[in-house]
Swiss-Prot record:
Pfam families: eIF3h_C (PF19445), JAB (PF01398). Residues 249-295 are annotated as: Disordered. It comes from Danio rerio (Zebrafish). Residues 250-261 have a biased composition (Low complexity). It comes from the Eukaryota. The lineage of its organism: Eukaryota, Metazoa, Chordata, Craniata, Vertebrata. GO terms for biological process: brain development; formation of cytoplasmic translation initiation complex; heart development; translational initiation. This is Eukaryotic translation initiation factor 3 subunit H-B. Signal peptide: none annotated. PANTHER family: EUKARYOTIC TRANSLATION INITIATION FACTOR 3 -RELATED.
Length: 333
């Protein structure tokens, strides 16, 4: 589990993680893991190791989850993690569990599986984070590595397992209050920084002008297609909820009419001196329809928001490149 370093006055801080410092070696390991085992839409995952210093989470190492098929029924992930951390401890490497990482394609990572996994990690280890690595965006020239945590409000909802509309409304949980992004700082050794500086000095002007090349339109096309698919899913969920609301309203109306008829009958029987009708259990007679789960709808809305942000970043970068290219060409052209 993660461990907090004590402050100079001997007190342990319980403030939430506000920043993540990740070693460059860890970033390279994550990229290498996807290049070796990620095929097409295959998702790769692994464990993050490190420690917590005050309000900063330091990620110093990681190791991957091996890919296994249905034939590997005897594979135990928990046992595998324990063996790996025990081996790292023997060679004096940080072995404290601080989260996990996962690859994604086109930013499509918001799912119930990720929510359940991160809740399990964060419930057991308060400082846990999940790193999301997008290899497609990284291949276009900019490293796409983001860290997320579940918000305190969502953690409470998941603990209570109350995903009804009333529960979510009472807790004020919307799609924008599900995940919180934690800023990442990549730390390299002095030798690596010197090497990067030398590579920058050796790069030619032609190489630098390649940065103005527009990104592939296929990325935008795929993002828009996935956005449309999620909007269709949202539309279907809205239809299901509207049908539930109509069924509930119709049943409440029938229940109200039944109660009124019973009251009128009892009033007539009382006027004739007859005993009132026996009371009946209305909850058994009018069972309310099962409400559809709202958490899936929130996840879809959150994923739609992520796609919109991805498309916004993509288009803004290309527009910026167009303006810079126009400025470099000069007024004569």
């Amino acid at each position: 589990m993660a461990s907090r370093k004590e402050t100079p006055n001997g007190k342990t801080l319980d403030t939430p993680v506000k920043q993540i410092q990740i070693e460059g070696l860890v970033v390279m390991k994550i990229i290498k893991h996807y290049q070796e085992e990620g095929q097409g839409s295959e998702v790769v995952q692994g464990v993050l190791l490190g420690l917590v210093v005050e309000d900063q989470l330091e990620i110093t190492n990681c190791f991957p989850f091996p890919q296994h098929t249905e034939d590997d029924a005897d594979f135990d992930e928990v046992q595998y993690q324990m063996e790996m951390m025990r081996s790292l401890r023997h060679v004096n490497i940080d072995h404290l569990h601080v989260g996990w990482y996962q690859s994604t394609l086109y930013g499509s990572f918001v799912s119930r599986a990720l929510l359940d996994s991160q809740f399990s990690y964060q419930h057991a280890i308060e400082e846990s984070v999940v790193l999301i690595y997008d290899p497609i965006k990284t291949a276009q020239g900019s490293l796409c590595l983001k860290a997320y945590r579940l918000t305190p409000k969502l953690m409470e909802i998941c603990k209570e397992k109350d995903f009804s509309s009333e529960g979510l409304k009472k807790a004020s949980v919307g799609y924008e209050h599900m995940f919180e992004e934690v800023p990442i700082v990549i730390k390299n050794s002095h030798l690596i920084n010197v090497l990067l500086w030398e590579l920058e000095e050796k790069s030619t002007a032609a190489d630098k002008h390649e940065l103005l090349s527009l990104s592939s339109s296929s990325h935008l096309e795929k993002s828009l297609q996935m956005l449309m698919d999620r909007v269709d899913d949202m539309s279907q969920d809205i239809v299901k909820y509207n049908n539930y609301s109509r069924s509930l309203s119709k049943q409440q109306q029938q229940k109200h009419q039944y109660v009124q008829r019973r009251q009128q009958e009892n009033a007539q029987r009382q006027s004739r001196g007859e005993p009132p009708l026996p009371e009946e259990d209305l909850t058994k007679m009018f069972k309310p329809p099962q409400p559809p789960p709202r958490m899936d709808t929130l996840l879809i809305a959150s994923q739609i928001n992520t796609y919109c942000q991805t498309i916004k970043e993509f288009t803004s970068q290309n527009l910026g490149k167009l303006f810079m290219a126009e400025a470099l060409q000069g007024p004569s052209s």
